[in-house]
A protein has these predicted regions:
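N-terminal export signals and maturation junctions of secreted/periplasmic proteins
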Residues: 3-73
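Extracytoplasmic/secreted envelope proteins and their assembly/folding machinery
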Residues: 4, 8, 49, 65-68, ...
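Soluble non-cytosolic domains of exported or imported proteins
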Residues: 4-5, 46, 58-66, 80-87, ...
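Peptidoglycan-targeting cell-wall enzymes and recognition modules
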Residues: 39-64, 94-213
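A short alpha-helix/helix-coil micro-patch that ends at or immediately precedes a cysteine
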Residues: 70-78, 95
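Surface-exposed patches in mature extracellular/periplasmic domains of secreted proteins
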Residues: 77-89, 102-106, 221-233
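Acidic helix/loop microenvironments that form the catalytic cleft of cell-wall polysaccharide enzymes
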Residues: 93-98, 179, 224-242
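Phosphate/ATP-binding catalytic cores across multiple sugar-kinase/actin-like superfamilies
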Residues: 217-218
């Protein structure tokens, strides 16, 4: 609930930082060195270092500079081109990645958290105790990933059909792109091999491209057009908890 309230607050605050779209196309004042301005619409042209600093307040200006061009280009390529959609897109990334500071899914769960978060239909109490974090025992994150994202559930929901797919295709990038199916579909969309994707989506360029692809391919552009962000969060991670 606190995360849901936080993202709503972030969404509202972020919307307040962007000026309304003018009735006529705004003239291009000066080309930005990070992208060809002529290829961006007015909303996409507002993506600069100042905007990213407001969108990702727990990161820093020096680190965020490298994300400006990738964000512009991803929004252009995938058609994220309205104020509401851009604000929702960035606000969701802010929550999903702790302000772009976490680009790889962590599975360092305690034994209790594994059952509480995923339920016994995804991991047994015995396996949670055996592989989860507890006093004197580190979490076995690779085994946890293969249990949570493997088996019949992983095959049906993530396309994880091979042994070890749960760990190999765990969440990476700003949208935590998870599963063989998602990463394969993204690879096809951008003309890369699926083997390249885990490393690629951890770069600013690949990360934002994957986030934009996920946003469009899962219909989040339509959900962003409705008030609030609940639908966005459910589509991204199955709930409003982060």
């Amino acid at each position: 609930m606190k995360i849901f309230q936080a993202i709503n607050a972030a969404h509202t605050a972020f919307m307040d930082t962007i000026k309304p779209v003018p009735p006529e196309p705004a003239p291009v004042i000066a080309p930005r060195p990070v992208a060809p301005v002529e290829s961006l619409n007015w909303v996409q042209q507002q993506i600069d270092i100042d905007l990213l600093c407001m969108a990702f307040p727990n990161n820093n200006r020096v680190n965020l500079v490298q994300w400006v061009r990738p964000t512009q280009m991803a929004c252009y390529r995938w058609g994220i081109d309205t104020i509401r959609e851009l604000s929702s897109f960035l606000a969701n990334i802010n929550v999903e990645t702790a302000s772009l500071t976490r680009l790889e899914e962590g599975l360092n769960y305690s034994t209790e958290a594994l059952i509480e978060k995923f339920g016994r239909h995804r991991i047994s109490i015995a396996d949670a105790n055996k592989y989860g974090r507890k006093a004197g025992q580190k979490a076995n994150q690779e085994v946890i990933a293969n249990i949570l994202y493997g088996g019949a559930w992983g095959a049906k929901n993530l396309g994880n059909t091979q042994p070890g797919d749960g760990w190999k295709f765990k969440g990476y990038g700003p949208k935590q792109l998870t599963g063989r199916a998602n990463q394969t579909d993204f690879a096809v969309a951008i003309g890369k091999s699926v083997e390249e994707i885990p490393a690629y989506v951890r770069t600013p360029e690949g990360g934002m491209m994957s986030a934009g692809w996920f946003w469009k391919s899962h219909g989040l552009d339509a959900k962003a057009a409705t008030p609030g962000v609940k639908d966005d969060r459910i589509a991204i991670n199955g709930g409003t908890f982060g």
